UniProtKB/Swiss-Prot annotation:
Species this protein is from: Saccharomyces cerevisiae (strain ATCC 204508 / S288c)
Compartment(s) where it occurs, according to its Swiss-Prot or TrEMBL record: Membrane
Transmembrane parts of this sequence: 68-88
Membrane topology field: Single-pass membrane protein
GO cellular component: membrane
Name of the protein: Putative uncharacterized protein YDL213W-A
Sorted UniProt keywords: Membrane, Transmembrane, Transmembrane helix
Major place of residence: membrane
Length: 100
């Protein structure tokens, strides 16, 4: 049976692999992050992030524009998706959504 979602459990919070590819390429990354900002600001990681954490070491590097974007706003290594761990400043989200 093919794997259709990336999740620690078989739940409705699973991330479909097609969506994960689009998130990782940057297409859905900001939208996903902005929807999770309120949860992250309370010091809690969203369930989707928790399900994704075990797979982080095995994911390829994000494309160059996303690496530069992460480095600019997090100050951390652009080879590591710090935003997925909740280290992203909430101001960056409002900055980018104001242009969309």
């Amino acid at each position: 049976m093919p794997v259709r979602s990336l999740s620690a459990s078989n739940s409705k919070n699973a991330i479909p692999l097609s969506a994960l590819r689009r998130i990782w390429s940057g297409e859905l990354f900001l939208k996903w992050f902005c929807n999770s900002t309120a949860v992250m600001s309370l010091g809690k990681l969203p369930t989707k992030t928790i399900n994704l954490l075990p797979f982080l070491p095995f994911l390829p590097l994000p494309p160059r524009p996303l690496r530069v974007f992460l480095f600019f706003f997090t100050g951390s290594s652009p080879s590591f998706p710090a935003a997925l761990l909740g280290l992203f400043p909430s101001g960056a989200c409002s900055f980018f959504t104001s242009f969309s």
